[in-house]
């Protein structure tokens, strides 16, 4: 069986949905160049974005600091390795991050910043396999989680939610971007 060069790993255990890791050599080279640069490192971010039937998709993204957008001057966001998996647990994320840590083991982890939402298993595996990297959380996810807790779990009225929210982020909790 010949595999496409973008499909780098397919594996399954017991009665679990198979895991698939997708990336190419260019993505790994660029992550090494842009996410480990001491002077202008890009954050390598991961987010379990959506569910396709029984499969979750966890893409990674980074900024290509060698390119600037003409209209804004910002660096464009590029897609990094993608992880397809059936469970969002430490076993699955551990396989993914151990694989990535082997690919990046010749890099200085202390220069690396990893970003994610606050999903526990994802965060634990990032910390376990990249122990010297800086872990940062996505503000948008934190804001949404706080809004949801204040509104749905605690049941605070909009006025109190706005007051608390504004004290932390200087904006209203019902504003999504």
Task: Identify the function of each model-found stretch.
Residues 101-177:
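Extended amphipathic alpha-helical interaction segments
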Residues 1-52:
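Electropositive nucleic-acid engagement tracts
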Residues 12, 23, 46-49, 65, ...:
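Structured beta-strand/turn binding interfaces of compact recognition modules in eukaryotic regulators
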Residues 15, 76-78, 128, 170:
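Compositionally biased, intrinsically disordered/low-complexity regions enriched for serine, proline
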Residues 1, 76-78, 150, 154:
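DNA- and nucleic-acid-binding/regulatory domain cores of transcription factors and nucleic-acid enzymes
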Residues 30-108:
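Electropositive, glycine- and tryptophan-enriched low-complexity nucleic-acid-binding patches
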